[in-house]
Each structure stands twice: as C-alpha cells, then as structure tokens.
Amino acid sequence: MTAKNTICLWFDGTALEAAQFYAATFPDSAVGAVFHAPADYPMGKQGDVLTVEFTVAGIPCIGLNGGPIFPHTEAFSFQIATDDQAETDRLWHALIDHGGQPSACGWCRDKWGLNWQITPRALIDALASPDREAARRVFEAMMGMTKIEIAGVEAALRG
C-alpha cells in the first residue's frame, strides 16, 4: 500500500472476507494485496491470511487478522454520505441483511462488528441549515430514526 496514512482494522481471521464484501458493496472500493503469514503466530498458522490491503469508499485500509482480542466498537465508524434514498437503502440493507445489526440515527454494525453511519447528504445539509429552528426539527426527527429516511428529514426541514 502506498498511502501515507492507512486505517488498520483488526479482525478475528475474517479480514479477507470483510474486504471482499466491502469492495463489492461500496463504490470506489477494492481489494489489493493479500499477505500470508510466513510462520506460525499466536493467533494463526504459517500460510494463513495475515493482512489484506483494501480501499473502502476511497479510504485506504489494511485488515489485520489478529484474533479475538480487540473487537470493534462504536468509537470508530465509517460515515458514508449517500446521494439519495435508493443509495441509502441499498447500503443499509447490504450491511444489515448480511448479518449486521441496525442502531439509531443511521448507524449500523456489520457482521464483523465494524460500525457504519449511512448518512444521506440531505441530512448533512439540513443539519447545517442557517435556520437553526429548522435544523433543530431535523435533529429531533433524526433522533427518532433507525435508517435515515430523506422524506422525514425534508418534512422536518419544512416544519
């Protein structure tokens, strides 16, 4: 990987599977080099996939198969800005329908425990509205949503 700054994500032996799923799901994503362990190590054997270089929505990452010691938490998430409800729905359901779990305010967790914010640009723009009362209504509407519904955001923005 030639990027100066790369996000390292810890997996329990499933880095390649996760990277392949992300590459198939998110635009501007791909799997790069796969490195196999040259010798046995505490959480694996010689020849096991040790690291996987991949890109998620243009962000360079490396998946490290380090074992079950450090699970993912909400302290780290990918925020994916979507252009419309169809894209929001597609990405949300790709994550949820393949073993993930929904959460609040557009957040969800994939089957590997990694957290995602599937966030329509319409929500981002509405929350930044110079009309702070409208932004408050949008915020309150968002707080009641699981997956973000743009129609609900727009209705709250209008009042």
Predicted features by range, described:
Residues 3, 48-50, 74:
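Residues that flank catalytic or metal-binding motifs in active/ligand-binding sites
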Residues 6, 49-50, 103-105:
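Short loop/turn microsegments at loop-to-beta-strand junctions
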Residues 9-58:
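Core segments of cupin and vicinal oxygen chelate
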Residues 11, 15, 25, 56-60, ...:
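Vicinal oxygen chelate
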Residues 45, 69-70:
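Gly/Ser-enriched beta-turn/beta-hairpin loop segments
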Residues 64-66:
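Active-site-proximal beta-strand/loop segments in catalytic clefts of secreted hydrolases
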Residues 134-159:
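Acidic/histidine-enriched, glycine/proline-rich intrinsically disordered or flexible terminal extensions
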